[in-house]
Regions:
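Secondary-structure boundary/capping micro-motif
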Residues: 1-164
Length: 164
């Protein structure tokens, strides 16, 4: 049975059991690019498909369910507008696969886009990485509010400080 590696598949690999998202695979399944979902790295890594398939067959690499889901429900209209703006700006360079995964070419593409869109190159790169890590969908550009706020803890009713 011939196994293929699919785009957007999430795999757990290595001794540290790191999660990786497959970003692109060549048409002949020779090589591809993936990015770590857990490390702070922002650079896609090249991999050899045959090695990954062999590691899957021996259990060193496991295909897992996608831990990052981005939904559109309960999203403010302003957030949708911001998402659409970033999608419009980055879409031309996102279509330049596999060039976008090579460091030098990615820098050139981002510089050109920064000049055209009047946006900061660092911000473009930040949104590009966000797009890769969150599943290569336009909804990846939505604001990430799930980690904001205090949480469900109640405040202490007793006032702090010296008694009056």
């Amino acid at each position: 049975m011939e196994q293929n590696i699919s785009i957007n598949e999430v795999m757990q690999a290595g001794q540290e059991k790191q999660l990786y998202r497959v970003l692109w695979v060549s048409s002949d399944q020779e090589y591809g690019y993936w990015i770590s979902l857990e490390k702070q790295t922002r650079v896609p890594e090249k991999f050899i498909c045959q090695e990954v398939i062999e590691n899957i067959s021996v259990g060193e690499v496991v295909v897992v369910e996608d831990p990052i889901r981005v939904y559109e429900r309960n999203v403010a209209e302003s957030a949708k507008e911001r998402r659409d703006e970033w999608w419009r700006i980055l879409k031309p360079i996102l279509e330049c696969e596999p060039d976008i995964y090579e460091r030098r070419r990615r820098g050139e593409l981002l510089s050109e886009t920064a000049k055209k869109s009047n946006k900061n190159k660092a911000n473009l790169y930040r949104y590009l990485v966000k797009y890769w890590k969150k599943g290569k969908t336009p909804n990846a550009f939505l604001p990430d509010f799930r980690n904001c706020g205090r949480g469900a803890k109640t405040q202490n009713q007793k006032k702090l400080g010296r008694p009056v």
